[in-house]
Amino acid sequence: MPSLFAQSLAIIATLQATLGLATPVSAPDTVTGKHAGGYVNAVYFTNWGIYGRNYQPADLPASQISHVLYSFLNLSNNGTVYSGDSWADIDKHYPNDSWNDVGNNVYGCVKQLYLLKKANRNMKTMLSIGGWTWSTNFPAAASTAATRSNFAKSAVTIMKDWGFDGIDVDWEYPADDAQAANMVLLLQAVRDELDAYAAKFAQGYHFQLSIAAPAGPANYNKLHLGDLGKVLDYINLMAYDFSGSWSNSSAHNANLYANPGNLNATPFNTDDAVNDYIKGGVPASKIVLGMPIYGKSFQKTNGIGKPFSGVGDGSWENGIWDYKVLPKAGATVIYDDVAKGYYSYDNRTQELISYDTPDITKEKVTYLKSKGLGGSMFWEASADRQGPDSLIGTSSNKLGGPDTTENLLNYPDSKYDNMRKQMA
């Protein structure tokens, strides 16, 4: 006969499975850097991707993903967080959605992501707020206790109404020390609100809190890194966009290291940023290495680190190409073994495109493991290939599979009837 302890564990496990509860997030393993549940393999999913790109939540390789960072929610200067596209988020009816449901129900990407969570219990969803376009109001929203409280309460309200597992703040970027200090206070307010909600409605569950963070020293040197390391679960390091139309020379987009023999090709590098974050007081296990699923193009250039003239067109905006269309026909793929970065070059058109490949993704995973980092992050899902050349899948396989910490399915305080019923 099982012991009372064993019987108790069995009862708890049954309740978790029945009610959609999940085990708390484990503390980091200080030897490997990863959390006890495994490595993060996170990806940003953009709600605008459902339009021209025709990339829907069901297209996500959910079994290979630990966190979906759903982008973006907007915010007002008084701290109120709100949907910037309610049709995409909560109104769009997908083929299996009924128009005759009774009650107040949620649809759109939110419902689709919840259904993915039900089918893939290790995939967590994070509500990502801000982004490059919608960061304007962060300074005001973080400036007073009242606006910080409003931000935290409104963000957590949307999170629980939509059935998400945490909040990701994408403030690009605090401009000075005062804003950096207020950022920490804002995040602490969110942490407190998440914990208060969990204590009341999801006891034992740890809602996660992360940020998207810069890899350029001019931006991260302003941050209070040690304080961020204490309040956050993860820091998603945006180790890309090292070059572009603003650059003086064609250069790598997301290289691991500097190339002393060709510094024009490596104005920034990932390793310096990672080391600076760790020196600044961020536990290595909380740093998630961001990788691009796109390439940066340079026109009329004689090679990497050389002058260029324009960036040309792109998949959706000038100078930026989805990984899934690269390399272009006629281009040769070249590896910079010093900087650890790939690019394609067409001798005829003199177009150079710097982008990540499956091989460099494997190399980056090896790197992040050696540094004790928490895992991988990708921007953004719609640009990836399917099949064996998927960058998301390549990372997942090299990591040994994504973090197995379970998501939450039970949201008894959601304002939506079908969410409270777990879409049953």
UniProtKB/Swiss-Prot annotation:
Assigned protein family: Belongs to the glycosyl hydrolase 18 family. Chitinase class V subfamily.
Enzyme type, top EC level: hydrolase
SUPFAM superfamilies given in the database record: (Trans)glycosidases (SSF51445), Chitinase insertion domain (SSF54556)
Residues annotated for chitin binding in this entry: G103, N104, G130, G131, W132, T133, Y173, M238, A239, Y240, D241, W379
UniProt keyword Signal, yes or no: yes
Biased segments, Polar residues type: 392-408
InterPro entries tied to this protein: Chitinase_II/V-like_cat (IPR011583), Chitinase_insertion_sf (IPR029070), Glyco_hydro18_cat (IPR001223), Glyco_hydro_18_chit_AS (IPR001579), Glycoside_hydrolase_SF (IPR017853), Glycosyl_Hydrlase_18 (IPR050314)
Keywords: Carbohydrate metabolism, Chitin degradation, Chitin-binding, Glycoprotein, Glycosidase, Hydrolase, Polysaccharide degradation, Secreted, Signal, Virulence
Record: glycosylation sites: N74, N78, N96, N248, N347
Entry EC number(s): 3.2.1.14
Protein's UniProt name: Endochitinase 1
Position of the signal peptide: 1-22
SMART domains: Glyco_18
Record-linked Pfam families: Glyco_hydro_18 (PF00704)
Protein's cellular compartments: Secreted
GO cellular component, one term: extracellular region
One example of a Gene Ontology biological process annotation: polysaccharide catabolic process
Domain GH18: 39-402
Name of the gene encoding the protein in the UniProt record: chit1
MF terms in GO: chitin binding; endochitinase activity
Broad class of the protein's primary localization: secreted
Coiled coil feature spans: none
Catalysed reaction, written as an equation: Random endo-hydrolysis of N-acetyl-beta-D-glucosaminide (1->4)-beta-linkages in chitin and chitodextrins
Transmembrane segment boundaries: none
Active site feature: E172 (proton donor)
Region Disordered, residue ranges: 385-412
